[in-house]
Amino acid sequence: MIVLTQSGTLLFDQRFKLSKFLFVVIATGFPLLLQQASLIYGYNHEQIYRICRSFLHVLPLLNCKRGRISTSGLQLPRHLHYECLEWGLLCGTHPAIQIVGLTIVIKLDDPTTAAAYRSELLRVSSSSYIQNAAGLSNGWGHDMEAFVRNAICLLELRERSIPQSGLRDLMGNYQHLVRSLLDACKVDHFVPLDFQHRSLMLNFARLYNQLDLQGRAKSFRALTGFPVYVPSEDYLEGSFLQKELQE
C-alpha cells in the first residue's frame, strides 16, 4: 500500500520484497493516486510537484532487486550508499539514510537537507581517498610537492563527487514533469506481467534519458537497473585500450 503525506512524500506501510510485480503495481497505480490527492484531498500544485519529485526519486530504487521495503524505509545494500546520496541530490529529494550493518535504510518519512547530503558525500569520498592512499610512498607528509599534489587531488575528488544542482530540463517545469510521469506510467493491463514490466522500463528509461544526470549515467544504471543510455566513448574510460591510445 502506498501512502501520500501532506509534505508530498511517498511512504510504504507494508513489508515487500522488491519485485517486478511491486514495480508494476506502484508505477501503474501512481496516476490514480495523484488524481485522488488532487481532487479528493485538495493537494495544491506545490504538493503535487513534491510528490512527483519523490516518485521520480524512489521509483528507480524500487527496481533494485537487492533490496526490500520495510516499515522503517527502503533497504538497500550498503555499497550503494554513495550512489543513493548522489541520486537524492540530483532529484532534489533528501530522505535520511541510516547505515545498519551491511545495509542502508532510506527513511522516506524523515526528510533531511541537501546540505546534509553534500556533507555526507564529502565524508564518504574523503574516507575512500584516505583508505586508497594509505601506505603510499608519496603520502601527505613526504614533502611539500607531494602534499600539494595530494591536496589538489582531494579537492578535485570532492568537487567531482557533488552534483552542481538538481535535475534540470524535465524537472524545471511542473506541468511538463507531471505530464511526462503520467505518460510513462501508461501500460496495457491485459498483457502478461513480464511484458508490462518491460514496457514500463522502456517508458521510464526514455523519461530518465531526458534528464541531466551530470555524467552519472553509469552509476545510476548500476544502482537502479534502468537501461539508461551511456555515450559509447564512456565505455572505454580507464580501460587498457584507452591507455594505449593515449600513449
UniProtKB/Swiss-Prot annotation:
Keywords: Host-virus interaction, Inhibition of host innate immune response by virus, Suppressor of RNA silencing, Viral immunoevasion
Gene Ontology biological-process annotations: symbiont-mediated suppression of host innate immune response; viral process
Annotated effect of mutating W87R: Complete loss of systemic RNA silencing suppressor activity
Effect of W140A: Almost complete loss of systemic RNA silencing suppressor activity
Every F-box-like domain range: 76-95
Domain of life: Viruses
Record remark: domains: The F-box-like domain is required for suppression of host RNA silencing.
Recorded family membership: Belongs to the polerovirus P0 protein family.
Task performed by this protein: Suppressor of RNA-mediated gene silencing, also known as post-transcriptional gene silencing (PTGS), a mechanism of plant viral defense that limits the accumulation of viral RNAs. The P0 protein suppresses local PTGS using its F-box-like domain to mediate destabilization and degradation of the AGO1 protein, although not via an interaction with host SKP1A. Participates, together with the proteins P1 and P7, in the inhibition of the induction of aphid-induced host phytohormones. This could play a role in the attraction to the infected plants by aphids.
Record's protein name: Suppressor of silencing P0
